[in-house]
């Protein structure tokens, strides 16, 4: 009885401690961010095992219609869990409906078709704009409470798309990312209280995980991978957070040939006035491991407002940039209250800020919108890198209220922090650097 009482008190104290943690702007972090129980499919309704409904284990047989029929059956009968058993199942675009969930058992593989005609063109969201484009392999729109779980794998089968992209780029060097027709792996939109846990998301033809206009999304213990060699997988961002709030990314491994965590939201000279766009707020990325990627945490390039963003307790190995602020001269942007702390490992650049001019277009706007990045804190960081401070001065944006606190940096290049670039730059405690000289 005494032990039980002690346990209860300890638990209450632990929850109280968590509840006192704050976002960078001082707001208390809600308890929701600390409740991370894994999905129990037994509490989600009837299980619909796809092989009970005519779907067979065959990696070469396209079975989109049969798998979709199981989803529709579940939806029409009060909802439930679509279960994919051990084996490999080839499919085009699948559309989940209210009350339905997806679970991949161990050694199960949902394999995407490498024929773009198996992904219908729909009204969707892509690269900061709402437009008609190809559906993803897994599409979840207006499905509150959706879960994707299990120890299986979603394989985008992207190599054919990647090779085609690079061939097009050789012939048309200025082609856009969307000119080469290819699907995303997972697109979740207008859905709240979503959880994606444990699965492996690999070899996406385009963006891997894209969430748009969602509230309360947890991405837990995912393994997200696309190769950087021998064939580079272009634009395969691990997680794109697009006009969302209350998002937790925890315990994930990410290694992709683009940005790992990319904060999106819109682009263009009037992007902040378009109701289809929006900011990202109250985002926590913690306890993750990052392999090769262009940016661990990237604001942009299609982004207008990011507020209360935390990246903490993460390990890096071969990432190019830790914090990358892409400043578009054709888009009004505000990146504020961003905290990066307790980071270890190696990276090419710790903080990278520069104008992003790819596909620059002011349209009919006469003046160039000025963007702002402020209240950016980096603390308790121990990294080996090529350079720490890669920040360009520009009239296109204003930087203010940055804080570097307790940084231990081993750099190949001299570490020079130009305090004239950032207004109200604060250097706290020991900021120690070791310059590795060539022998």
State where each predicted segment sits.
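Conserved small/polar residues in nucleotide/adenosyl-binding loops
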Residues: 434-439
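Bacterial Sec-dependent N-terminal signal peptides
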Residues: 1-22
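N-terminal extracellular ligand-recognition/capping segment immediately after the signal peptide
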Residues: 64, 79-125, 131-134, 153-154
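Extracellular polysaccharide-degrading/modifying enzymes targeting complex plant/algal/animal polysaccharides
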Residues: 111-189, 195-200, 269-271, 363-366
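Right-handed parallel beta-helix
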Residues: 106-107, 144-153, 192-203, 215-228, ...
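Short glycine/acidic-rich loop motifs that flank beta-strands on beta-rich extracellular proteins
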Residues: 79, 92-93, 113-115, 134, ...
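Acidic Gly/Asp/Thr-rich repetitive segments characteristic of extracellular carbohydrate-active
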Residues: 50-83
């Amino acid at each position: 009885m005494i032990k039980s009482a002690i346990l209860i008190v300890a638990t209450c104290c632990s929850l109280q401690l968590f509840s006192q943690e704050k976002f960078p702007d001082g707001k208390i972090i809600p308890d929701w961010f600390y409740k991370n129980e894994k999905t129990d499919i037994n509490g989600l309704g009837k299980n619909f095992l796809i092989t009970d409904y005519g779907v067979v284990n065959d990696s070469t047989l396209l079975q989109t219609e049969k798998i979709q029929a199981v989803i529709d059956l579940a939806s029409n009968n009060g909802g439930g869990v679509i279960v994919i058993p051990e084996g490999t199942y080839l499919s085009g675009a699948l559309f989940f409906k209210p009350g339905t969930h997806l679970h991949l058992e161990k050694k199960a593989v949902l394999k995407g078709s490498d024929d773009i005609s198996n992904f219908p063109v729909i009204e969707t969201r892509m690269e900061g704009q709402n437009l008609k484009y190809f559906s993803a392999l897994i599409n979840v729109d207006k499905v509150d409470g959706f879960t994707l779980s299990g120890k299986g794998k979603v394989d985008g089968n992207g190599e054919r798309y990647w090779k085609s992209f690079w061939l097009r780029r050789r012939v048309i060097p200025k082609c856009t990312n969307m000119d080469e027709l290819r699907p995303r792996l997972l697109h979740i939109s207008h859905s709240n209280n979503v959880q994606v846990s444990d699965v492996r998301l690999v070899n996406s033809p385009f963006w891997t995980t894209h969430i748009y206009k969602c509230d309360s999304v947890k991405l837990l213990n995912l393994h997200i991978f696309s190769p950087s060699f021998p064939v580079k997988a272009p634009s395969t961002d691990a997680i794109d957070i697009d006009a969302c709030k209350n998002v937790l990314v925890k315990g994930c491994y990410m290694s992709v040939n683009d940005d790992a965590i990319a904060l999106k939201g819109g682009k263009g000279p009037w992007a902040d006035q378009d109701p289809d766009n929006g900011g990202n707020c109250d985002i926590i990325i913690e306890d993750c491991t990052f392999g090769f990627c262009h940016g661990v945490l990237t604001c942009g390039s299609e982004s207008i407002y990011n507020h209360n963003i935390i990246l903490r307790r993460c390990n890096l190995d071969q990432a190019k940039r830790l914090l990358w602020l892409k400043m578009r001269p054709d888009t009004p942007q505000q990146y504020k209250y961003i905290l990066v702390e307790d980071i270890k490992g190696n990276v090419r650049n710790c903080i990278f800020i520069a104008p992003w001019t790819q596909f620059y277009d002011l349209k009919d706007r006469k003046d160039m919108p000025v963007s702002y990045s402020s209240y950016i804190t980096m603390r308790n960081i121990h990294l080996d890198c090529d350079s720490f401070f890669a920040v360009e001065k520009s009239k296109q944006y204003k930087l203010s209220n940055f804080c570097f606190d307790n940084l231990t940096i081993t750099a190949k290049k001299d570490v020079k922090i130009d305090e004239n670039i950032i207004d109200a730059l604060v250097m706290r405690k020991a900021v120690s650097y070791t310059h590795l000289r060539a022998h």
